[in-house]
């Protein structure tokens, strides 16, 4: 009976996902709409979310109230066309290839007659897979012979590409339009040596990419992506992981999770599928993704040898790279730093090697007693990646899986090797970022950032958390969010989210949202701490709305308007609760902000009476004297009328 129930539940989940993705409409957030800022070259239109705010009541009478308008607030938006009702969405067709013209105009790529990966050729010839296939497959593009088509290569030639101008506009989020002094106010941050400018220019973007301090992940076979940038001098980014396994999920569910992730703020998405139909799932995901897609190619290579790590070969892995490059994957996690001599260093760990990719390569090294073929063939991998503009995400295969193992010899030995490989990739003008831990207690986190900056020459750092304690299964989005905020403040450029299901199971749609909101909080907190220009505008706008009891604006400015509204309405569901000058926590008589407003009004009254309210002590004393005088007058009145509670009507 239980098996039947399980099957029914999985069918229902898949059916719900199908219903969602096949009936998508551009659904904006409440009181929000898409605005597009135009660039100077090649039809650049950068989408942002603009939140319309209600007016502030500033006085007047009940009959003639006086209001002051609040200017709209622009926020960074990762959702692409999925929140724009003006776009016709059809996942069977995929998204518009708006970068295609930019790629073609450079003249350094060519269209191939057909796919060149042997594995893809076999899949295409299998008619049994026709019902799963993405129908409208694009033509494959590759760099012409002898051409390097990476954004780093262009940057080092002094070329500002449309993609670079796009991200400059995107990072600034229309801040020049902000006129309110209150919204622009910001605390001075501590950036720990970062070089964050007041305003991001296309030239600054070019220079950061040329120096290797930032990456712009955009495979030429993924023209549907909206360009974004990862680097310590830019806004902190967040990655969401999706992916099926041999026991869970379907193509429909993974596409749903990708779309859902971009709605809730995923700057990139990693497809970590390990089950059946990896190739077909990835095609659907890439064709419908407005954000860069990353993968761990060794996972699929392992599937091709039936899960036997010892049977992996360079030839199988190389074909997997080409297969995924031709599909449009934007960055590859490559565990090239797991060297044979480092594996014994993990023997005394509490949790050993916890990285899937790391454990696969460690097993291969020990079985053959040879050096990691990802390391020995690293320059061959560079040659492939620069033909498609794919970024290296150098994997931390020896990351600590428990706080007991944090910052040990194995972890930092691998990190030093990743630094060497970074410089080798840069010789080929291939973009690189570095993956980091893991499980690290708070007092040991900064050492990770310092070591990474030292050995990897400021290449962007990308960490999974880190988790700051191991005692909270089911709440590891919180244990890791703490560490994520901290390491991002120190300079980590992108955070890989952790969901409540970490260590327990594959996340569902709601887990994805929970993890993303947690990590958007961590990323934003780090931007504030670094003093990133404009980071505080959203906080200021929400605080102003909160003080003025503009409840709808409070909900809509927040990261999760749905939950904020839901929590408020649990106790004050009526529409009158949305204009009330209190919430259910304090009630009408004890609301600190309501009392603060009354104090402000009282200060205005004092000014009108010629009393300086700047002297707080005098103000409080005067108010107390006024209150005491009024109370005494009422007491005298009560006594004069006979000290009776009730009186007969006259």
Curated annotation (Swiss-Prot):
Reaction(s) this enzyme catalyzes, per UniProt: 5-amino-1-(5-phospho-beta-D-ribosyl)imidazole + S-adenosyl-L-methionine = 4-amino-2-methyl-5-(phosphooxymethyl)pyrimidine + CO + 5'-deoxyadenosine + formate + L-methionine + 3 H(+)
Binding-site list for [4Fe-4S] cluster: 583, 586, 591
Cofactor: binding comment: Binds 1 [4Fe-4S] cluster per subunit. The cluster is coordinated with 3 cysteines and an exchangeable S-adenosyl-L-methionine.
Gene3D superfamilies associated with the record: 6.10.250.620, Radical SAM ThiC family, central domain (3.20.20.540)
Pathway(s) where this gene product acts: Cofactor biosynthesis; thiamine diphosphate biosynthesis
Binding positions for Zn(2+) per the UniProt entry: 439, 503
EC supergroup of this enzyme: lyase
SS bonds (residue pairs): none
Keywords (A to Z) from UniProt: 4Fe-4S, Iron, Iron-sulfur, Lyase, Metal-binding, S-adenosyl-L-methionine, Thiamine biosynthesis, Zinc
BP GO annotations: thiamine biosynthetic process; thiamine diphosphate biosynthetic process
EC number: 4.1.99.17
GO MF terms held by the record: 4 iron, 4 sulfur cluster binding; carbon-carbon lyase activity; zinc ion binding
Cofactor(s) annotated in UniProt: [4Fe-4S] cluster
Positions with a binding annotation for substrate: 241, 270, 299, 335, 355-357, 396-399, 435, 462
TM spans (from-to): none
GO cellular component terms listed in the entry, alphabetical order: cytosol
Presence of the UniProt keyword Lyase in the record: yes
Function as written in the Swiss-Prot or TrEMBL entry: Catalyzes the synthesis of the hydroxymethylpyrimidine phosphate (HMP-P) moiety of thiamine from aminoimidazole ribotide (AIR) in a radical S-adenosyl-L-methionine (SAM)-dependent reaction.
Assembly description: Homodimer.
Family: Belongs to the ThiC family.
Listed name of the protein: Phosphomethylpyrimidine synthase
Organism: Pseudoalteromonas translucida (strain TAC 125)
Classification of source organism: Bacteria, Pseudomonadati, Pseudomonadota, Gammaproteobacteria, Alteromonadales
């Amino acid at each position: 009976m239980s098996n039947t129930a399980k099957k029914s539940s999985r069918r229902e989940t898949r059916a719900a996902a199908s219903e969602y993705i096949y009936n998508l409409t551009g659904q904006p957030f409440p009181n929000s709409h898409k605005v597009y800022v135009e660039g100077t070259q090649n039809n650049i239109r950068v989408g942002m979310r603009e939140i319309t705010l209600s007016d502030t009541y500033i006085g007047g009478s009940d009959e003639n109230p006086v209001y002051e308008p609040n200017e709209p607030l622009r926020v960074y938006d990762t959702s692409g066309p999925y929140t724009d009702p003006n776009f016709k969405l059809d996942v069977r067709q995929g998204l518009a290839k708006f970068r295609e013209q930019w790629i073609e105009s450079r003249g350094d790529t060519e269209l191939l007659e057909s796919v060149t990966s042997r594995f893809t050729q076999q899949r295409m010839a299998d008619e049994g897979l026709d019902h799963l296939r993405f129908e409208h497959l694009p033509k494959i593009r590759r760099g012409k012979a002898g051409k390097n088509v990476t954004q780093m290569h262009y940057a080092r030639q002094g070329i500002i590409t449309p993609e670079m101008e796009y991200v400059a506009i995107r990072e600034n989020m229309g801040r020049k339009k902000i006129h309110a002094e209150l919204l622009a106010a910001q605390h001075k941050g501590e950036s720990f040596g970062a070089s964050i400018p007041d305003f991001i220019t296309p030239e600054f973007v070019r220079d950061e990419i040329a120096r290797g301090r930032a990456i712009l992940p955009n495979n030429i076979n993924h023209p549907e992506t909206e360009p974004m940038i990862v680097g310590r001098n830019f806004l902190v980014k967040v990655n969401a992981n999706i992916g099926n396994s041999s026991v869970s999920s379907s193509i429909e569910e993974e596409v749903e999770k990708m779309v859902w992730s971009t709605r809730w703020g995923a700057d990139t998405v990693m497809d970590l599928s390990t089950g059946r139909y990896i190739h077909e799932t990835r095609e659907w995901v890439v064709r419908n993704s407005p954000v860069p897609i990353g993968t761990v190619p060794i996972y699929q290579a392992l599937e091709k040898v039936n899960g036997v790590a010892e049977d992996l070969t360079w030839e199988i892995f190389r074909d997997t790279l080409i297969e995924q490059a031709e599909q449009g994957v934007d960055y590859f996690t490559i565990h090239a730093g797991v060297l044979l001599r480092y594996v014994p260093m993990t023997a005394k760990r509490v949790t050993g090697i916890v990285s899937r990719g790391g454990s696969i390569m460690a097993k291969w090294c020990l079985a053959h007693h040879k050096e990691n073929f990802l390391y020995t063939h690293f320059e061959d991998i560079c040659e492939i990646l620069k033909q498609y503009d794919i970024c290296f995400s150098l994997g931390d295969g020896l990351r600590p899986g428990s706080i007991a193992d944090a910052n040990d010899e194995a972890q930092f030995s691998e990190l030093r090797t990743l630094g060497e490989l970074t410089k080798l990739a840069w010789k080929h003008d291939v973009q690189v970022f570095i993956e980091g831990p893991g499980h690290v207690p708070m007092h040991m986190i900064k050492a990770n950032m310092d070591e990474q900056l030292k050995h990897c020459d400021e290449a962007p750092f990308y960490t999974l958390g880190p988790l700051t304690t191991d005692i909270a299964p089911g709440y590891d989005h919180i244990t890791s969010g703490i560490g994520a905020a901290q390491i991002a403040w120190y300079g980590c450029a992108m955070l890989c989210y952790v969901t409540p299901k970490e260590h327990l199971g594959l996340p569902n749609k709601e887990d994805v949202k929970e993890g993303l909101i947690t990590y958007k909080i961590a990323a934003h907190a780090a931007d504030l701490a670094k003093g990133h220009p404009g980071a505080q505008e959203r906080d200021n706008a929400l605080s102003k709305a909160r003080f003025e009891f503009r409840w709808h604006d409070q909900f809509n400015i927040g990261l999760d308007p749905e939950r904020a509204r839901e929590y408020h309405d649990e106790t004050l569901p009526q529409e009158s609760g949305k204009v009330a000058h209190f919430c259910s926590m304090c009630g009408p008589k004890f609301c600190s902000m309501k009392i603060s407003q009354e104090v402000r009004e009282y200060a205005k009254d004092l000014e009108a009476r010629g009393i300086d309210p700047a002297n707080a002590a005098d103000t409080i004393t005067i108010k107390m004297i006024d209150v005491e005088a009024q109370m005494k007058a009422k007491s005298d009145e009560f006594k004069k009328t006979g000290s009776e509670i009730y009186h007969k009507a006259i």
